[in-house]
Structure formats: structure tokens, C-alpha cells
């Protein structure tokens, strides 16, 4: 599946989730005012989600280019790399104002696209993310991803995605 197709699927899912959220949410204001003007809100949310998905996918592809794939066969380095990517997605989601549902969908798609997890593994992994403390070892790995994507997008370090290759080697030899 190409990156473009993945992005279309993510945007479609986001639009449907947001549509259902608006359609099935009881609201006294909506019943008094008649139909709500949810169209622009859905369109805006879908655009933000598409933007995050595109940036996250590009970052994941750039990060995975130099990674030793053999090192990712061990669960430790693979899970650590997934935590790193989760941090990057989290940073992008926060920066663009995505909600939890959209963040979850993008994270699952990016982890699967990067080859770090299967669809089922990515779903379980992303479901566990809210329970991880920022001060835990896992939280620190997520912070590395957040810091790296920030450095990349701010122009501080154009080679920032290559840091993942170095980290994977460190994790594989630890």
C-alpha cells in the first residue's frame, strides 16, 4: 500500500469518526438551533489529521532509512523504536491540535507503515500509550522521538531522523 493510499484511508477514517461523533452526540444546543454546521469542523479536523499523518509518515520513512533491520528482529530495539515513533507522532498531534482518536489512528498507521508492528500489535501498543508515565523509561524514549521530530521540523537538525539508527544500534547492543 502506498503512502498516498495510507493517508487517504487515515483521512477517511478520521472524517467518519468525527462525523459519527457529531451525529450521535446529544446536545441541547443542537436541538434548539436545528441542524449544526459540522461540515467545516469535519473538514478542518480531516485536514489536520491528514497533515499530521503525512508529516509522521515522512519522518518515519526518513528515520527508518538507515536503521539496521536485523537489529529490529529483537523485541527490545523494535519496541523502543516504536516508542520513539509514538513520541514523534505525539509531538505532531499536539502541534496540530489532534484529539486522542485521531492521534491513535495516525500512530497505528505510522507504526505499521514503518514496519515496526503489525496492525494488531500497533493497535494494542497505541492503546497502552496513555498509561505510560513521562518519567518512566518508556516515557523517556517517547521524549527522544518528540525532541527529534521537533529538531527536524524547526530546522535545527536536518539529519535528526538519522538519530533513530544510532539509537537502535545502542538498544541492540545493550
Question: How does the language model describe each region?
Answer:
Residues 103-120:
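Short, mixed-charge aromatic SLiMs
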Residues 26-74:
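N-terminal topogenic membrane-targeting module
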Amino acid at each position: 500500500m502506498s503512502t498516498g493510499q495510507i493517508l487517504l484511508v487515515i483521512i477517511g477514517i478520521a472524517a467518519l469518526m468525527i462525523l459519527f461523533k457529531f451525529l450521535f452526540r446529544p446536545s441541547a444546543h443542537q436541538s434548539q438551533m436545528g441542524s449544526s454546521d459540522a461540515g467545516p469542523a469535519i473538514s478542518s479536523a480531516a485536514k489536520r489529521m491528514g497533515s499530521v499523518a503525512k508529516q509522521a509518515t515522512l519522518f518515519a520513512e526518513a528515520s527508518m532509512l538507515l536503521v539496521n533491520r536485523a537489529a529490529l528482529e529483537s523485541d527490545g530495539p523494535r519496541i523502543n523504536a516504536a516508542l520513539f515513533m509514538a513520541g514523534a507522532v505525539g509531538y505532531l498531534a499536539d502541534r496540530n491540535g489532534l484529539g486522542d482518536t485521531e492521534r491513535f489512528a495516525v500512530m497505528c498507521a505510522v507504526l505499521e507503515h514503518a514496519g515496526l508492528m503489525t496492525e494488531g500489535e500497533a493497535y494494542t501498543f497505541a492503546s497502552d500509550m496513555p498509561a505510560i508515565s513521562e518519567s518512566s523509561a518508556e516515557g523517556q524514549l517517547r521524549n527522544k522521538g518528540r525532541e527529534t521530530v521537533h529538531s527536524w521540523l524547526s530546522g535545527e537538525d536536518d539529519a535528526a531522523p538519522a538519530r533513530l539508527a544510532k539509537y537502535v544500534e545502542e538498544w541492540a547492543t545493550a
